[in-house]
Amino acid sequence: MGFVLFVIIALTIVLDQISKLIVARTMSLGDSIPVLENIFHITYSVNPGAAFGIMAYQTTFFIVTTILLLLVMVFLFYRLGQEFQIVKIALALQFGGAVGNLIDRIRTGYVIDFFDFRIWPIFNIADMAIVLGVSILIYFILFMSKDYGCFD
């Protein structure tokens, strides 16, 4: 399973960074390409904050916090037993997404976003991986944790 987790993390980081590179090299900041007019666009945007732009320009805080959370995730990878593979997959998605956005913050001080559904803040592949990982973790906690003897 370790190899699968490595692939999830690596694939998340690579897809995230390549997609951001393509957007940054082929579009100007603010450009928007309609994929489905008024529903889904590729829009080149930068976010110096967290989700929804909160705490903008707190780059050092985000870098330090992300590194600390990554260390916690590494600890959890080693601490969780084989029976918690679904939790490890959730953590791998979050880990890959966090590293993808961390690379941006270290390199530029902001995160490149481009998926634009017009009714929601613009986001990227790293954000999608983090949200998917958190969603899997919430599902596990709500519906599966009793089967594993958690929270007894």
UniProtKB/Swiss-Prot annotation:
EC number per UniProt: 3.4.23.36
Domain of life the protein comes from: Bacteria
Subcellular location: Cell membrane
Membrane-topology annotation of the record: Multi-pass membrane protein
Enzyme kind, highest EC tier: hydrolase
One GO BP annotation of this record: proteolysis
TM region(s), chain numbering: 3-23, 57-77, 83-103, 122-142
Entry's Gene Ontology cellular component terms: plasma membrane
Catalytic activity as recorded in UniProt: Release of signal peptides from bacterial membrane prolipoproteins. Hydrolyzes -Xaa-Yaa-Zaa-|-(S,diacylglyceryl)Cys-, in which Xaa is hydrophobic (preferably Leu), and Yaa (Ala or Ser) and Zaa (Gly or Ala) have small, neutral side chains
Pathway the protein acts in: Protein modification; lipoprotein biosynthesis (signal peptide cleavage)
NCBIfam families membership: lspA (TIGR00077)
Protein's job: This protein specifically catalyzes the removal of signal peptides from prolipoproteins.
The name this protein goes by in its record: Lipoprotein signal peptidase
UniProt source species: Natranaerobius thermophilus (strain ATCC BAA-1301 / DSM 18059 / JW/NM-WN-LF)
